[in-house]
Design a protein with these regions (language model features):
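N-terminal amphipathic alpha-helix/helix-capping segment at the start of soluble metabolic enzymes
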Residues: 1-17
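Active-site beta->alpha loop and helix N-cap motifs at the rims of alpha/beta catalytic domains
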Residues: 65-123
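Conserved small/polar residues in nucleotide/adenosyl-binding loops
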Residues: 149-156
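Short, well-ordered coil/turn segments that N-cap beta-strands
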Residues: 12-16, 41-43, 89-92, 119-120, ...
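Alpha/beta enzyme core
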Residues: 30-53, 105-121, 127-128, 133
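Glycine-rich, proline-tolerant flexible connector loops at the mouths of alpha/beta enzymes
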Residues: 46-73, 129
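Active-site mouth loops of central-metabolism enzymes
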Residues: 17-28, 94-106, 148
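Active-site-adjacent beta->alpha loops and helix N-cap segments on the catalytic face
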Residues: 2, 56-58, 73-80, 103-105, ...
């Protein structure tokens, strides 16, 4: 059972999930932000993958993504920063990002890197459920990646 299922099946009354955009406030601080959030009682962390056209996000996340990209954050760098995170971080980690940068990275390569870094789940808000079922499900399942869906993507 992965850490997300363990968390939601636990008897924990209050679950606090926090989102932040990788590469903010500084390029090299992503792992430190995760460690600090866990230390202060966060139950699960959603790490945003910055993208130049975050159409489903509000202005705050759009600005964070812009700053992260200006700082030099990329998916490749994010995986490098998360490579050793599981040595000391025990809470569930979820990557949240748009399909375009994931496809540029290569969907199977993305799944492989998620496993190598101990990522528990992935949210891709612009991936329609039907496309997932037809093209990506078999790859995600091969790597035991838990894809979490937004209602809009699931309804398309």
């Amino acid at each position: 059972m992965n850490r997300i299922n363990q968390l939601f099946n636990s008897n924990k009354k209050d679950i606090l999930s926090i989102y932040f955009c990788a590469g903010t406030p500084t390029l090299d601080g992503t792992a430190d932000v995760i460690r600090t959030l866990e230390k202060h009682g966060v139950s699960m962390i959603e790490v945003g993958i910055p993208f130049s056209d975050p159409m489903a996000d509000g202005i705050v996340i759009q600005n964070a993504a812009t700053q992260a990209l200006r700082n030099g954050m990329s998916l490749k760098l994010l995986f490098e920063q998360l490579r050793d995170i599981r040595k000391d971080v025990k809470i569930p980690l979820v990557l949240m990002g748009y399909l375009n940068p994931i496809m540029q990275f290569g969907f199977e390569n993305f799944c492989r890197k998620c496993v190598e870094c101990g990522i528990d789940g992935v949210i891709i808000p612009d991936l329609p459920f039907r496309d997932y079922q037809e093209h990506y499900r078999i790859i995600a399942e091969r790597y035991n990646i838990c894809l979490l869906y937004t209602s809009d993507a699931a309804d398309e």
